[in-house]
Amino acid sequence: MFILRLFSPAFGEIEADESQIFSFPEGLPGFSHLKKFLLIRHRDNSPFFFLIAIDEPEIYFILIEPSRLLADYHVELSCEQQGLLHLSEETPVLSLNIVRIPPEAKEMIINLKAPVVFNLQEKIARQIILDADYPVRYPIPLSKVKEKADAGTK
């Protein structure tokens, strides 16, 4: 197992092992040239993750576990989408959503329409556009996020 060391203007010096590196065969929309990303959890039991581009560590995304906030949100992948991610019924999967938190905001905006789905076994991931009628911009008060995050640490 190797250790990756990189410097990110937002996070400083980062050390991570290869288990945290994911390949995005098509990149992400708007960032198709970036194929390798580092996924790190904000802190233990936090619903937040950071997805940092390895080749351009100044580019990163904030992700969240939607199940921690929205009980009725479900990601259902088509057979084609499952094939692109090499998924079977036994494959461990993590589904996260991109979040935007405007400066001095009282709410954050979650993209529920296009989750980022990670195949934890093969270390590949893709942003998938769901057929379900979920919004691209779903606001959630930061107070609710803090309440749920605090509940996860108890």
UniProtKB/Swiss-Prot annotation:
Stored Gene3D superfamilies: BH3618-like (2.30.290.10)
Main localization category: cytoplasm
InterPro entries given in the database record: Flagellar_assembly_factor_FliW, Flagellar_assmbl_FliW_dom_sf
Keyword field contains Protein transport: no
GO CC annotations on file: cytoplasm
GO biological process: bacterial-type flagellum assembly; regulation of translation
Subcellular compartments: Cytoplasm
The entry's keywords: Bacterial flagellum biogenesis, Chaperone, Cytoplasm, Translation regulation
Keyword hit for Protein biosynthesis: no
Source organism, top-level taxon: Bacteria
Family affiliation: Belongs to the FliW family.
Family matches, as PANTHER family: FLAGELLAR ASSEMBLY FACTOR FLIW
Function: Acts as an anti-CsrA protein, binds CsrA and prevents it from repressing translation of its target genes, one of which is flagellin. Binds to flagellin and participates in the assembly of the flagellum.
Quaternary organization: Interacts with translational regulator CsrA and flagellin(s).
Protein name stated in the entry: Flagellar assembly factor FliW
Taxonomic source organism: Carboxydothermus hydrogenoformans (strain ATCC BAA-161 / DSM 6008 / Z-2901)
Gene (UniProt): fliW
